Swiss-Prot record:
Gene3D superfamilies: MFS general substrate transporter like domains, Multidrug resistance protein D. The chain crosses the membrane at residues 31-51, 226-246, 253-273, 298-318, 361-381, 386-406, 497-517. The gene is fnx1. This is Multidrug resistance protein fnx1. Efflux transporter. Confers resistance to a variety of toxic compounds. It comes from Schizosaccharomyces pombe (strain 972 / ATCC 24843). The keyword Transcription does not apply. Belongs to the major facilitator superfamily. Pfam families: MFS_1.
């Protein structure tokens, strides 16, 4: 039997030398192409956590602390809106020009951030960086799918996620250190050389052709202009709605209602255009009409929603309820970051060995659900919450998130034809990014709303209640210095708010688990040529 296999391999090499040569080239190229892409991915993850640690400092310098969150929002809007465009654009213009554009836009935007003279200008610079940042992760996945077999794809994705995890872990401490010694502008400028290096590497190394057939039509005429405009506009309106709702404006205000209705109508118009007008749609309706791609995209939305709630809510819980300093609160999240990378890599190795992903998907979403429920229970203990149990739950949910990142990507790729992979990858990243933005916004709004009610109830006998609530909204640093009896009531109010927030997020986690049950198992090919 072994001789027959060897003979068949030899015959293939002799009769079809171009096929053998192509496989050898791909085997060599992936060791040079993928590390070149990882530089951009590392930089993107590093940048996001750097900015998360710097925006309060930047807002204070411009004396616009109440608007400092728009530094983050501007990046998230363009990052989310442009992610699905990269799939189709890379099919039209090619992989290399598209990934070079993404790196160049990110680098130019980051440089602009360092020389911005006002907060509005800085927000515009962050928006430009977001356009590029949206393509760094998406194009890395698309190109990986072009040159790596489905059986090995999970392993390489796991390594990619480790690189992103390292970048994300270093960003906060590194950004804070640089800003403290040399100023926040240096924190942006020191990224520029790495951005230039990443741009040069992908321009030099990435030589990958799209899997779709070339068209005789003009490249520019193939772009879905109307669909692109509607998608970017609709996503922008949606993200702005969930960022401003409950903060800048009440949820029932005319501004928020108008934005929400407008985003729904625009996205419905986008759906109609993609289904009836677009010749080469950026989001083919046929893909989302299939059970596995649809449930993968929805699952990515719910999974990212839960993940970002954990990352943003638990540090606040540590600071307000357990009275930890911000530096220690950030370190307490490390089990989540580390286990995310471990879960992603281990799931990739498992899929490479067994060729199966469905059980990983189900297990990942199940443990995410159990973790969210556990957080709802543990936060109810307030200042008596056992830290060891919190750390174990962080490790469990981080591992499950990493498993889901890798296994769902393989699930959607394996369920579609090669020419649909790039667009489908962009769609999955769109749902993931949208889930993260909405998760952050809704969880923070929910926590704040419940907290205000709890404070008003628990402090009803305090004559200075209104002034204390106002001060707590401005800064949580006053909690450790409050009188013990008042401090106990404030901590109790925060604990109740976090408990209810995680209880409501558990519904989202269950929706993700339900989607995972509807994802089917497809064959994972062992070669790049899936024919």
């Amino acid at each position: 039997m072994v001789d027959q296999v060897n003979l068949a391999t030899e015959q293939t090499s002799l009769l079809y030398p171009e096929v053998s040569r192509k496989k050898e080239e791909l085997s060599v190229n992936k060791w040079t192409i993928l590390p070149a892409l990882w530089v951009g991915g590392f930089l993107s993850a590093l940048d996001m956590t750097i900015v998360a640690s710097l925006y309060p400092v930047i807002g204070s310098e411009f004396k616009l602390m109440n608007n400092a969150s728009y530094i983050v929002t501007a990046y998230l809007i363009t990052n989310t809106a442009f992610q699905p465009l990269y799939g189709r654009l890379s099919d039209i213009f090619g992989r290399r020009p598209t990934v070079v554009f993404a790196n160049a836009a990110f680098t130019l935007g980051t440089f602009w951030c360092g020389i911005s003279r006002s907060l509005p200008e800085l927000c515009m610079a962050r928006a430009l960086a977001g356009i590029g940042g949206g393509g760094l992760g998406t194009m890395s996945s698309i190109i990986s799918s072009d040159i790596v077999s489905l059986r090995e794809r999970g392993t390489w994705q796991g390594i990619t996620n480790i690189v992103w995890g390292i970048g994300g872990s270093l960003g906060g401490p590194l950004g804070g250190l640089i800003a403290q010694r040399w100023g926040w502008r240096t924190a942006f400028h020191f990224q520029v050389p790495m951005g230039i290096l990443s741009t040069i590497l992908v321009a030099w190394r990435v030589r990958v052709k799209p899997t779709v057939r070339n068209s005789n039509a003009s490249l520019l005429s193939r772009i879905d202009y109307l669909g692109s405009f509607l998608l970017v506009t609709g996503i922008t309106a949606l993200v702005v709605t969930f960022n401003m709702g409950g903060d800048a404006f009440p949820w029932v205000s005319p501004v928020i209602i108008t934005l929400l209705v407008s985003s729904v109508l625009i996205l419905f118009a986008f759906y109609w255009v993609e289904k009836n007008i677009a010749v080469e749609p950026i989001a083919p309706v046929e893909i989302l009409s299939q059970p596995t791609p649809l449930n993968v995209c929805l699952g990515n939305f719910f999974n990212a929603f839960c993940s970002f709630v954990i990352v943003y809510e638990l540090p606040l819980f540590f600071e307000t309820t357990l009275l930890m300093p911000s530096s220690e609160a950030g370190v307490r999240i490390f089990p989540y970051v580390i286990s995310t990378s471990v879960g992603s890599l281990c799931s990739g190795l498992y899929m490479k060995k067994t060729g199966r992903y469905r059980n990983l998907v189900i297990a990942g979403f199940f443990f995410m659900l159990m973790g969210i429920v556990s957080f709802a229970v543990l936060t109810s203990f307030g200042h008596r919450t056992p830290l060891i149990l919190i750390s174990l739950c962080l490790a469990m949910t981080g591992c499950s998130y990493g498993m889901n990142l890798t296994s769902t990507l393989i699930a959607i790729i394996s369920s579609l034809a090669p020419e649909e992979q790039a667009v489908a990858t962009g769609l999955s990243y769109l749902f993931r990014a949208t889930g993260s933005v909405i998760g952050i916004s809704l969880s923070q709004t929910t926590t704040l709303s419940i907290l205000m009610k709890q404070l008003a109830s628990n402090l009803k006998d305090d004559p200075d209640k209104d002034d204390l609530i106002r001060r707590l909204r401005e800064s949580i640093s006053i909690i450790p210095n409050l009188p013990k009896d008042i401090q106990k009531l404030v901590i109790k109010s925060y604990a109740t708010a976090f408990t209810w927030t995680f209880a409501l997020v558990a519904i989202i986690a269950f929706a993700g688990f339900w989607c995972s049950l509807r994802i089917k198992q497809f064959y994972l090919h062992t070669s790049v040529d899936r024919s």
